[in-house]
Amino acid sequence: MKLVIVEVGSELVAELWDAPVEAAAGILCYPEGRAALAAARRGGRLSSSAYGRACEEFESLQSELLLVGIDQPLAREAGELAERHGLRGYDAVHLASALALGAGTTLVSWDEDLRRAAAQSGCPVAPPG
């Protein structure tokens, strides 16, 4: 969302997006992103016209992502990660997705619990903290 709505971390996310590596995300980023945009609209952070533009930009960005789907093994791994690290279900799916992509994958998150779990699982995190 930090590419669509300017907030803390938007500059770093833009730099990472423009880096010469493929951007990937778990498939849950789509409903989470749409929910965040709708919440921003309801909360008055986006006008009706800004909301429409943000949705269009979000859809465009989605088309550029490598999306990691959820299958039974990934769901089970997410369950294990949730239990081991005390994560919420969707955060565990995001971490399992990053781990499934393998070495060299950096998980980008501002959620401290998810960042801690990623680091403990051997997954690099951004922003550095």
Residue spans for each PLM region:
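Acidic catalytic patch
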Residues: 27, 53-84, 92-93
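Residues that scaffold the ATP/ADP-binding catalytic core of kinase and kinase-like folds
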Residues: 2-4, 36, 117
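Short active-site oxyanion
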Residues: 20-23, 64-66, 102-106
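Short glycine/serine- and small hydrophobic-enriched flexible loop segments
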Residues: 35-42, 103
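Short, well-structured N-terminal submotif of metal-dependent ribonuclease cores
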Residues: 1-29, 40-52
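Acidic, PIN/NYN-like endoribonuclease modules and their adjacent C-terminal/linker elements
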Residues: 95-129
